[in-house]
Design a protein with these regions (language model features):
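A short acidic (Asp/Glu
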Residues: 71-75, 153-158
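Membrane-interface soluble catalytic domains
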Residues: 16, 20, 28-36, 47-53, ...
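Histidine-centered active-site/metal-ligand motif
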Residues: 67-69, 105, 149, 161-167
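Short, solvent-exposed loop/turn segments at the edges of secondary structure
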Residues: 172-176
């Protein structure tokens, strides 16, 4: 009776509100309510959007937090289930974390959950893009997907772990959020190692559409000139604005990076201020 009522810690709570009780990297019971709310939007984008012929350009911007809410999903489609069991799939596809000779270490539940939610989000976005193709609005649409940050201390790639003399060991991929751009009538996939920041988003969005764009709030030109050369950045643990809430950043350790961020030689420790 005890094991029946306990049910791996969920106590037979409603499936949409019971937190996952994981068992290793392949099995989970329960769901993350925060994930379901965000994921459901991506899953139903084709039902929430419609294509129509107009004589003017259109602009759509949306924010979604699916990849902020981690949980295991059911493979191979990476969909949420109350009972997740990927044991067989994981055994048969253990090589899926290696690409072009580079292997991502996905051995802990925290790492696997991050992998799953990103797979689920990208697959659902891909389904929406298929819907756009079917309705003739994919090629004439510029699409930009920008994330706000990487996964903190995921430590999946050995060559991205920096050992700074004063700051200690850091996973620099914390500061490498996803940035994808699909231009008008583009085809195929391309990886570009050009140094980019999220501030490049409006530059790319208006490229070729608005001549010499200006920020309407500041009156300054919208361009990427400021990212040339070494870029200072703060690696602060105080991300919560209830703690870091002054007019300046709370004291923390500063670093700089330039050009290819995947070359640890381009990272430098500065000081603490």
């Amino acid at each position: 009776m005890h094991s029946f009522l306990y049910n791996y810690g969920t106590y037979y709570d409603a499936s949409a509100s019971a937190w996952q009780a994981y068992d290793g990297v392949s099995q989970d019971i329960g769901m993350n309510e925060g994930f379901l709310g965000c994921y459901s939007v991506l899953k139903n984008l084709s039902c929430m959007t419609a294509a129509e012929k107009t004589d003017h350009d259109t602009f759509l911007m949306m924010s979604n937090s699916t990849t902020h809410e981690i949980q295991l999903l059911q493979t191979p489609d990476y969909t949420p289930k109350y009972y997740v069991d990927n044991t067989t799939y994981d055994l048969l596809h253990s090589d899926r974390f290696t690409y072009n000779g580079v292997t991502a270490h996905i051995t802990a539940p925290y790492q696997m959950k991050h992998y799953h939610i990103n797979m689920g989000a990208l697959l659902r976005m891909g389904e929406w893009f298929d819907y756009m193709r079917e309705n003739g609005v994919y090629d004439n649409t510029r699409i930009i997907i920008a994330a706000d940050h990487g996964a903190p201390e995921l430590c999946s790639f050995d060559d991205m772990i920096a050992d700074f003399s004063a700051g200690g060991i850091k996973d620099v991929l914390d500061y490498n959020p996803l940035f994808l751009v699909k231009d008008f009538n583009s085809r195929g996939f391309k990886t570009d190692m050009t140094f980019m920041t999220n501030a490049d988003t409006p530059v790319l969005a208006m490229k070729g559409l608005i001549s010499e764009p200006v920020n309407p709030f500041t009156g300054k030109p919208v361009n990427s000139d400021a990212k040339q050369g070494e870029q200072p950045l703060i690696l602060s643990e105080l991300w919560d604005i209830e703690q870091n809430d002054g007019n300046t950043f709370a004291p923390s350790r500063w670093y700089s990076v330039h050009d290819n961020i995947f070359d640890l030689g381009n990272w430098k420790e500065l000081d603490f201020h």
